[in-house]
C-alpha cells in the first residue's frame, strides 16, 4: 500500500502558529509570511480580488488595521511566496512527511501560490454570464503567474531527494495552460 497525503502550500489555518505570530503585530518577523495590505483609500479591501467562496478575498484585521488575503474562506490566510523564508519552510514540511514515510503528495491549488506583486485589480470578464460572481473577473493577477513553475520545481527537487516518491498538483486551467505544468518525471 502507498500513502499519498494532501499538501496545502497556498494557505494555512488562521489558527496556525505562523499566522498567529504574523497577526500579532506589523513588526513581527513572520508578518511578511502572509499577504497583508493596507486598506484602499475608501477604507475597503486593497483591490477587487474575489474569494472562490463568494465576496472579497480580503478580511480586515481590526487590531492591525490591515487586510489579509484569503482566496478561500477567511480562516485560510494565504502564504506569501515572495517572502524568501516561506518556500524553505514549506520544503521542510514536505521533508518532515517524507521522512515519516509518505510516498508523495497531492498538492492543493498549486497554481495559486503566487499573486501579482503590484496587487492590481483583476479585469472584468467580458464573457461573464451573470451567474457565478467569481467568474465576473479574469483572474490574471491571482493565478498561474510567472514564477510559480520555479516554486514547483523546487518542490519537485525535494521529492527527488527520496527514492520512489511522487507529487501531483491540483490545477484547474485551460488545457493549453495546463500542459506547462507537466513535468518530465
Regions found by a protein language model. Name each.
Residues 1-95, 99, 111-174:
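Acidic/aromatic-lined carbohydrate-recognition and catalytic surfaces
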Residues 105-107:
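Hydrophobic residues within beta-strands of alpha/beta enzymes
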Amino acid at each position: 500500500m502507498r500513502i499519498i497525503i494532501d499538501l496545502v502550500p497556498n494557505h494555512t489555518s488562521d489558527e496556525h502558529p505562523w499566522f498567529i505570530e504574523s497577526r500579532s503585530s506589523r513588526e513581527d518577523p513572520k508578518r511578511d509570511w502572509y499577504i497583508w495590505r493596507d486598506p484602499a483609500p475608501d477604507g475597503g479591501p486593497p483591490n477587487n480580488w474575489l474569494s472562490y467562496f463568494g465576496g472579497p478575498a480580503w478580511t480586515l484585521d481590526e487590531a492591525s488595521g490591515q487586510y489579509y488575503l484569503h482566496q478561500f474562506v477567511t480562516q485560510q490566510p494565504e502564504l506569501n511566496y515572495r517572502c524568501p523564508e516561506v518556500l524553505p519552510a514549506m520544503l521542510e514540511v514536505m521533508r518532515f512527511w517524507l521522512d515519516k514515510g509518505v510516498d508523495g503528495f497531492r498538492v492543493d491549488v498549486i497554481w495559486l501560490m503566487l499573486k501579482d506583486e503590484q496587487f492590481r485589480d483583476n479585469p472584468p470578464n467580458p464573457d461573464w454570464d451573470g451567474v457565478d460572481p467569481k467568474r465576473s473577473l479574469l483572474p490574471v493577477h491571482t493565478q498561474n503567474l510567472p514564477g510559480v513553475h520555479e516554486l514547483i520545481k523546487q518542490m519537485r527537487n525535494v521529492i527527488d531527494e527520496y527514492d520512489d516518491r511522487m507529487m501531483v498538483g491540483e490545477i484547474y486551467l485551460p488545457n493549453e495552460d495546463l500542459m506547462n505544468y507537466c513535468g518530465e518525471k
